Amino acid sequence: MKDLAPDIFRKRLLVEGYFTIEVNEQTLIDFFAYITSRLSLRTYGQPIVHATSGTGKDENQGYDAFVPLIDSGIYIAIWRQQKFLSLIIYTCKDFPEDQAVALTRSYFNIAVAEHSLF
């Protein structure tokens, strides 16, 4: 992918994996506090968590959650039935991606995760 704005620093990390803990709205709010504090990412608003609550296909039930960062934001999608998550950390600030992956794996008790910078 061609970098259309080389003068603007951007870092985008995608992490996906199957988790083994029970996830609810509070779990996601607590995760945002956990990961932002450990990566020194500053928020400027409260996390927003949406539950699909029976809309759409059964296999897609779960949560969509976002927290705004001073330097962009973090989004996570949760598929409750499959116990699968997809996390995107998008920042205009550098952060240690290996630590972000390790923190996510630890918090959600993920045995195998895949990740990619883009």
Q: What role is predicted for each listed range?
A:
Residues 1-118:
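Polybasic/polar functional segments that serve as interface/processing modules
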